[in-house]
Amino acid sequence: VGPMVGMNLDASHLMWMGGDPIAAVHKLGADRIYHVHAKDVRLERNYVGADGVLDTKTIDKFAKRTWNYVALGHGHDVRWWKEFLSVLSMEGYDGPISQEMEDLTMPALTGVKKSTDVLKEAMPCDYE
């Protein structure tokens, strides 16, 4: 990591593995984070307890997976996203935050709208 290579912090990847994206922001600091993906994860209770998180089923098998990518707010609530974005800001990150929509439980445009609404509410300052 340096001026030419930095981290694309995708919170969802840490989430499904049991990591803590907020702790990762504190550890990495803004000088190592070059881009942030806003993507959420939901652990599926009916399966994850018995099978764990190392699910090898493809994303299209979402009804039987132990975890799934979901629209923002459908895995972690707005309060969590407020804290995540606030910590990014406190650490000095002011770069892009991109939505990545992979929620197959709803139409893509619905998921984008729901995620956008969560991001707008969670942002530490007003963006239009």
Where are these regions (language model features)?
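A structural motif corresponding to the C-terminal end of an alpha-helix
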Residues: 1-3, 83-94, 125-126
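A general structural detector for well-ordered alpha-helical segments in enzyme core domains, enriched
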Residues: 24, 80-84, 103, 114-119
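Acidic/histidine-rich catalytic cores of soluble enzymes
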Residues: 1-74
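C-terminal helical cap(s) of enzyme catalytic domains, especially alpha/beta-barrels
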Residues: 108-127
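Soluble or luminal CAZymes and related metallo-dependent hydrolases
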Residues: 17, 76-80, 111
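A short pocket-lining beta-strand/turn micro-motif at the edge of beta-sheets
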Residues: 32-34, 68, 84, 93-99
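Conserved, mostly hydrophobic/aromatic
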Residues: 10, 36, 88, 97, ...
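A short, acidic, flexible beta-alpha connecting loop/helix-capping segment that sits on the rim
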Residues: 98-108
